[in-house]
Amino acid sequence: MSVVSNHHSNGNGNSTVYDTNGNDEIKKEVKDEPMASDSEVPFGELMKRDKKEKKQKKRKAESGSDEDDYKPEKRKSSAKNGKKKDVGSDSEDDYKPEKKKSKKNNKKKAQESSEDDDEESEGDVSEEDVKPQIHSDDELEEEDEAPTTDDEEEQKRKEKERRKKEKREKKERKEKKRLEKENRKIKEEDDEDSDDEDDEKAKKKKRKSKGAEKSKPSTSKKDAGGKKEPPKKKVKKEEDIEDIWEWWKEEKKPAGVKWNSLQHCGPLFAPPYIPLPSHVHFKYGGEKMKLTLETEEIAQFYAGVLDHEYSTKEAFNKNFMKDWRKVMTVEERERIHDLKKCDFRAIDAYQKEQREIRKAMTKEEKLKIKEEKEAEVKIYGIAIIDGHRQKVANFRIEPPGVFRGRGGHPKMGLIKKRIMPEDVIINCGKDTEIPKPPPGHKWKEVRHDNTVTWLCSWTESVLGQNKYIMLNPSSKIKGEKDFEKYETARRLKKKIGGIRERYTDDFKSKEMRVRQRATALYFIDKLALRAGNEKDVDEAADTVGCCSLRVEHIKLFDSAKLNEDDKKEKEFVVEFDFLGKDSIRYFNRVSVEKRVYKNLKIFMEGKAPSDDLFDRLDTATLNDHLRSLMDGLTVKVFRTYNASITLQEQLIKLTNPKDNVAAKILSYNRANRQVAILCNHQRAVSKGFDESMQKLEQKIKDKKKEVKEAEAALKSARGAEKEKAQKKYDRLKEQLKKLKISRTDKDENKQIALGTSKLNYIDPRITVAWCKKFEVPLEKVFTKTHREKFRWAIDMTNSSDEEYVF
């Protein structure tokens, strides 16, 4: 690169040499000759100098009045235009306002501009070549601030540390969320009821959608001022919208009045029967036989149970054949009379094929079905009660099919007939529009009864029971009923001492009726037995309660062990063994008071095993007596009271405030388990239990390995790495502890249904108060269904400063 010595003087006797390409590299400094005086300068040149000085003064004045108006000038680069500029030129075109950047850049550019403008050639000094250096206010401020560089560095350092701290905290929060998510997954594997499973599906779906949103690039825009636009509010789907009705803060309606206005769209009937395709045949005696649609539909019902044990039961087959023949034509009845000659295999194969087709549906096909169901919910799933939108619980009428029953139900195999509009009674407000029946049909009856809570009613064909369409458990009507139930149980707590004294005195009554009532009430109080209703064993399953116990259901032992593991025997032992509600076996050995034991011996004397134990007592008589002791008291209130008080006492006994959340939840589940055992809320061990436990054991094994590796890494770590290794080790130890707790919880509750007592018998305010006191998230113990149903309890408990005590 050639260097031409071009000297621009700054008027102070020094000049700097630059290369002609505009590079800033300083080559050398030379001493300037003194500037020529006015007398030596020609008059024309002097006029030009004066003119230039006036311009400079004007610039200074403008710069002083508004610092933002003036910006350091920059020499035009001749290279830009592709032509060389005369070095000595003083043309105004050689100046171009410099774009304002940072203060540092302003200072640097100002210096460069000053040096460029003050270059002077080695020859005669020309006035046009003199360009005085002008400093803007910004530049002066920069010069003043120059000594404070250390403060700026310190400020930057602090800012850097702050950002690091924020990043570290963010990372810790993320790790905490990850741990919570992992714990949630472990907990989710142990969901004990269908409500938990439904809720979990919703959670997974929500997490999946959130993950999809995170994977998308951010589309947020900023306005001119650099501020982010406010996020758009998420609009709820119409079907998700239900009025949050704080009915517990309103005045109560007159006694017996459930609603003032009620509007709904009636029930949704089962879809019509779709005939079998022409290539699928029913065979009788090895020959193909064409059936009428009514007969063919019922044949499909039986084909659906071919692989089930029901098809091997004599009672089931006998009842099915009897009901099936009722719908057959005369010709069909003459030919079909032996179920063993009926061949349903082709129909069964077709049904299995259809199931596989449904499983293999595309995403779009499944979405279409989902949208159709959502559309049905919008129409039939909402009722308007007193101006508030409330969910309807079961708006779909059950389709026809075969009655299976629980246990050895005597009516298993009978046909559940198709319900038609002509079978249905509608209940709605007088001033509201009556639901329209399907075209060509009419309702059996339309009522306007505001003393009942059902929307529709009909009688089913097998058991002759009334079926109802009701509002969702989260509705006001259901909530009021629950609130009254638990308040009655709380009132019982204040009177239970006197009631117990009363029935204890009645153990010795001279009247056998009073003795039986007192003894039965003792079992209802101590064992939380159901009352039991009289049933015709030929019409219903042989399930019993306290009042309907038979001699064959109990055994007496003067002394015996209550459990196989017990070392000592107890006196006056009674063994109960019978089928309770839903044909669930109740087996229990208890030690009773001596007077109760003697009474049972008296009640059993001279009776056959099939005779009633309490032959002078029934449920109605017992409930009448209870109402005389306390207003609103029934056998069910005793059950609710004992369930609630047991949970509260167990929570006080088991909860350790120093435990982590997982350990506290284990304590809660153990307390809940005692309630479930008391109420005999059992369930069958799930088919996938063993597989699930194996997976959990493998997780524990893998986690132990991780803990061991982390421990080794901690021992070898030094300096800053040691703190990081310690955190990792502690985190893994905590995860292992939670997995072990989950294993214990899962194993203990494999045959116990915790959800039933939580949903129907335990005062929810006990649980809410416990969560509040021990800082346990309510979602850990209450599913979405629980939280919606007990919205009133959550609000009442959390809004009160006092701790709730049952």
UniProtKB/Swiss-Prot annotation:
Gene3D superfamilies for this protein: 1.10.132.10, DNA Topoisomerase I, domain 2, Topoisomerase I, Chain A, domain 3, Yeast DNA topoisomerase - domain 1
Primary localisation category: nucleus
Subcellular location: Nucleus; Nucleus, Nucleolus; Chromosome
Active site (record annotation): 761 (o-(3'-phospho-dna)-tyrosine intermediate)
Keywords attached to this entry: Chromosome, DNA-binding, Isomerase, Nucleus, Topoisomerase
Top-level EC class: isomerase
Reactions catalysed: ATP-independent breakage of single-stranded DNA, followed by passage and rejoining
Tissues in which the UniProt entry reports expression: Expressed in male germ cells and in mature sperm.
SMART domains: TOPEUc
GO biological process: chromosome segregation; DNA replication; DNA topological change
Biased composition (Acidic residues): 113-127, 138-153, 189-199
Protein name from the UniProt record: DNA topoisomerase 1
Designated gene of the protein: top-1
